[in-house]
């Protein structure tokens, strides 16, 4: 039995693409820990694209014949078709996507398949695949963020004139336009798009041709493969080309910030849909019920988006820990780079699709919003501004006067507008009847006409700008 096992191991070693130096194959546990195919097969398209570009370059530079290159390219497209059709025979024994594709290519075209890996290592191959995959992910996320923005802009246009309470410390602060509130998240999403665009720009350099770590003695044309694959340029240092993973960390950082930003609006949706707030509701498409309480209507989609940053930040922290302290150039530790990235991107994309859906689905309750906007003396700042503007008082004095009048209204249990003129004049004799024109939530909202302010005039201006930017 031992002899049979030894022979099997020897066969495994000799059949592996790296097996020439080995006389025995890996143990089953070694094979299990070493295999990454369950994860990195997601990069099959990128792997094939990279191999196609590499084969074209090898033929153009005379490293391989045009006939071999044509066979390789024909075979790779057949491999791609099999993968897309779900017919591809993935094998854990072949470790990863690169070995699986190459092994199947050899079955299809024979000896020319062995020429494909000339002037290339799995080190530069996987770095190329990973950059291509992340570039595609950045583009998908940008489109999803734009769809989320579009949903918000449409709601903002509809609700530009709707007054609602603005909050600080989750306490009623000043009245604002609901449209203005929603547009704030459009601005946030634009910064998220900028972060992904910046990350995409920095990752869009080609490591292909860096080989294992030192480059190659073959007369390759790295500019050609970089251009063929849509990269801006080849990476200038072969060690950096195979060792760098900061591009993945940067995308994960952008994803973490984006997820946190989404979670803030998700939390507001949760609050707004409670009976305590009563500002909005989600349709059945974005709600669930309870297994025991028949009356429940839960905003589970928003709650799950609120939770996603925990997983995505965890992915960032995990990869930072993997990369920390690694010496140049490649170490097998870097095989652990893709799982956290794929998970984080999956989570973020699902969160973005959910937030775009909920943003467009929200139905608001105008009466509840307007009533809440006028509570808790939200027009006190308007009273202070009136004292500055009409009575010429310094703002600090006006602040004290307004605070004293609020205290008087609190003692009587009435809003500011229900105090008598005489009561206000007991605090500041110069106040006259014109003060009542500023004492309402709607008047407060309408008066904030400064650039970036909450006046519906300014909100509609910003809506027009965003509709033009987004083409919606």
UniProtKB/Swiss-Prot annotation:
<dbReference type="GO" id="GO:0006526">
    <property type="term" value="P:L-arginine biosynthetic process"/>
</dbReference>
<keyword id="KW-0963">Cytoplasm</keyword>
<dbReference type="GO" id="GO:0042450">
    <property type="term" value="P:arginine biosynthetic process via ornithine"/>
</dbReference>
<protein>
    <recommendedName>
        <fullName>Argininosuccinate lyase</fullName>
        <ecNumber>4.3.2.1</ecNumber>
    </recommendedName>
</protein>
<dbReference type="InterPro" id="IPR024083">
    <property type="entry name" value="Fumarase/histidase_N"/>
</dbReference>
<dbReference type="GO" id="GO:0005829">
    <property type="term" value="C:cytosol"/>
</dbReference>
<dbReference type="InterPro" id="IPR008948">
    <property type="entry name" value="L-Aspartase-like"/>
</dbReference>
<dbReference type="InterPro" id="IPR020557">
    <property type="entry name" value="Fumarate_lyase_CS"/>
</dbReference>
<comment type="similarity">
    <text>Belongs to the lyase 1 family. Argininosuccinate lyase subfamily.</text>
</comment>
<dbReference type="InterPro" id="IPR000362">
    <property type="entry name" value="Fumarate_lyase_fam"/>
</dbReference>
<keyword id="KW-0456">Lyase</keyword>
<comment type="pathway">
    <text>Amino-acid biosynthesis; L-arginine biosynthesis; L-arginine from L-ornithine and carbamoyl phosphate: step 3/3.</text>
</comment>
<keyword id="KW-0055">Arginine biosynthesis</keyword>
<dbReference type="Pfam" id="PF14698">
    <property type="entry name" value="ASL_C2"/>
</dbReference>
<dbReference type="InterPro" id="IPR009049">
    <property type="entry name" value="Argininosuccinate_lyase"/>
</dbReference>
<dbReference type="InterPro" id="IPR029419">
    <property type="entry name" value="Arg_succ_lyase_C"/>
</dbReference>
<dbReference type="GO" id="GO:0004056">
    <property type="term" value="F:argininosuccinate lyase activity"/>
</dbReference>
<dbReference type="InterPro" id="IPR022761">
    <property type="entry name" value="Fumarate_lyase_N"/>
</dbReference>
<dbReference type="Pfam" id="PF00206">
    <property type="entry name" value="Lyase_1"/>
</dbReference>
<keyword id="KW-0028">Amino-acid biosynthesis</keyword>
